[in-house]
C-alpha cells in the first residue's frame, strides 16, 4: 500500500521537476502527503540529490508520537518554525533525552540513536532533513488516516534505512531533560 499524496493546491510531483536537475518550489509547493492529522511536504528527495539528502516540511496539530525507530546510516535533523516539537532520543546504552523544541530550535537525531517526535502544540511547523537521503520515502508507505500498521512498518524496513521499535518505551514527562 502506498500513500500517493494529497492533491491539494500547490502539489508538485518531484518526479516532474527533480531527479538531479535544479528546480525551485514556490511557497506552498511540493509533494504533499497526508500522514494522520498532519501534512508532510517533500521538498527534495534522495533521487534529486544523488543520494545525499532528503528534506521535508511538516505541519500539524498536537498528535501522538511517531513510532520509535533508529537508522544504521541516516542522520535526521529538525528545525522548528512554529509551535512545539517534542523529541525523544535514546542511544540504547542508557543515555535518554527528551526535549521540547520551540521556534528557532534545532535538534540532531544521530545515526544509531532510537528516536521519536510529536507535534506538542497546535500549528507546529518544522523542517526535517535526512542525510543521506532516502528515509523521506517512508512517507509514501504510511497510512494517511491512523497509526502505521505492522505491515506498513515492515515494508518500509525492507526499502529504507530504518528499524522500527513500536514497543520501545518513550521517556516519561518526569524524565524530561531539555
Regions found by a protein language model. Give the residues of each.
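Short acidic-glycine-tyrosine-enriched beta hairpin
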Residues: 26, 48, 91-111
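Conserved hydrophobic/aromatic beta-strand scaffold that supports enzyme active sites
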Residues: 42, 55-59, 77, 98-100, ...
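Short, charged/polar surface micro-motifs in flexible loops or helix N-caps
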Residues: 48-51, 60-64, 84-86, 93, ...
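Short beta-strand His + acidic residue motifs that chelate non-heme Fe in jelly-roll/DSBH
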Residues: 67-68, 87-89, 99, 109, ...
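A short beta-strand-loop-beta hairpin characteristic of the jelly-roll/cupin
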Residues: 68, 72-103
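Double-stranded beta-helix
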Residues: 120-178
Amino acid at each position: 500500500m502506498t500513500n500517493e499524496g494529497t492533491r491539494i493546491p500547490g502539489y508538485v510531483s518531484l518526479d516532474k521537476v527533480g531527479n538531479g536537475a535544479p528546480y525551485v518550489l514556490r511557497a506552498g509547493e511540493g509533494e504533499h502527503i497526508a500522514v494522520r492529522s498532519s501534512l508532510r511536504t517533500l521538498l527534495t528527495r534522495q533521487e534529486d540529490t544523488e543520494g545525499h539528502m532528503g528534506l521535508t516540511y511538516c505541519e500539524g496539530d498536537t498528535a501522538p508520537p511517531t513510532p520509535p525507530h533508529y537508522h544504521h546510516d541516516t542522520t535526521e535533523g529538525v528545525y522548528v518554525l512554529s509551535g512545539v516539537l517534542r523529541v525523544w532520543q535514546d542511544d540504547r546504552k542508557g543515555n535518554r533525552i527528551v526535549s521540547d523544541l520551540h521556534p528557532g530550535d534545532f535538534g540532531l537525531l544521530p545515526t544509531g540513536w532510537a528516536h521519536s517526535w510529536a507535534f506538542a502544540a497546535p500549528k507546529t511547523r518544522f523542517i526535517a532533513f535526512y542525510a543521506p537521503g532516502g528515509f523521506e520515502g517512508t512517507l509514501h508507505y504510511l497510512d494517511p488516516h491512523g497509526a502505521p500498521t505492522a505491515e506498513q512498518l515492515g515494508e518500509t524496513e525492507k526499502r529504507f534505512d530504518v528499524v522500527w521499535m513500536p514497543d520501545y518505551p518513550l521517556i516519561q514527562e518526569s524524565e524530561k531533560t531539555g
